[in-house]
Amino acid sequence: MTKHIPIEVFTSVWWIGLLSSIFTIIVILVALKGKSNQVKSYSSYLFALLFSLMYVITNVITIKNNTWNLLQNLPFQICYISLIIGIIVLVNKKQWMFEWMVFIATIGGLYAIITPVLTIGNSAWFYFEFYFLHAGIVFIPLYLHNIHNMRCRFDSCWKTLLRVQISIVLLLIFNFSTGANYMFLIEKPIVNHIFLIGEWPFYVIIINLIVIGHVYLINKFIVSQ
């Protein structure tokens, strides 16, 4: 298993990752605003291709380094699940996938950028991949909302939460069966986080309740406006 390496908050690396993520998202959104439908369509395919290449290259590197294994490198973390959904929704514009990105990917991506932990390697590539991935899953719903005018449906937040609960149950079964720790459902990540309270299973329950609260707030104060 690859050692998990937290990036200390307020260090130069942390600031570079945070600010470059915010800057890149804003620049791309501003650049694409008001462009023709053809440009918007091409940009969706381009982003899907870039995210796909990033995922493939990262896995090739881990295989080459002999660090790839079933217990750590399957796309079963919430942000990798969101990445795959994000790649697909860029192409097919499926409504439920967009809603997943709004309610779940946004939360996961933002908190990952604020309290980053490298889980699959610590070379320069994995630093870049970490911020590319998590800024990407924050970017995708903003892009679809602002550039393609996609909107969430009424009560979509609760349907999205149901999908998350199903994912948690399935991954708990997988984790217990294999000894994996996908979505950190068995063991807490090694990062100082205000919401990581207590030991298993209490921190899982608390995080789940906090996610529900975040989704409710996003729905009430942003989506419903």
Summary of predicted features, one role per range:
Residues 41-46, 73-75, 98-106, 130:
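Cytoplasmic-side transmembrane-helix entry/capping segments in multi-pass membrane proteins
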